[in-house]
């Protein structure tokens, strides 16, 4: 029997974050998350991805069929929730990237060891199409959201390993302008610079929490040699549409 995945929604919009911000994409949002982030009064912006059991069970074939109907550029964002906690997620990634030749940007929260996912992918087929067509955009959770302790303990080493395997890796630090958030990002940049092959100037992003003092974060970036290696990115979909609007 084919594996089935809990799908909350499939829709077409623009990628609002990270390296591929502004590109048209088909989003596949899977149900379930292992973290509960909260930034001050701001809860997770997609609580419906883990509350209420509002999802449809779909096979990889069914998901890819729906994506192919909507897509005009073969670019997919696999998001959640946390997509990598789904059992046998490697088979969905393989079907998308290899069998359907889709470019897949996997949005993951930094608490799941991607190295194990890559190892499972390689057991299906050690194909160059995997690294050519699968992107990992990894959130590094800052202290202010309460989930920093859930990050993989060797986060920088994990990023380096995946990058060395040939996959495009983007790291996104969602922060407020608090001192502890700024310090955490500085420590991460320093660690990545020392031990990894990741080009931080291209693939490390500072993403201000929607509604916070963005100017204060930019001021910190301008004053810090470490932070000035990062790129600022805004969740542009929240500025185009109502930030609570679904399906965009």
Task: Identify the function of each model-found stretch.
Residues 64, 84-247:
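Conserved AdoMet/S-adenosylmethionine-binding subsite of the radical SAM
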Residues 5-15, 24-25, 35, 39-133:
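Conserved Radical SAM active-site core
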Residues 1:
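Short, Gly/Pro- and small/polar-rich lid/capping loops
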Residues 19-21:
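A short catalytic or substrate-binding loop motif that flags glycine-/basic-rich loops and adjacent residues
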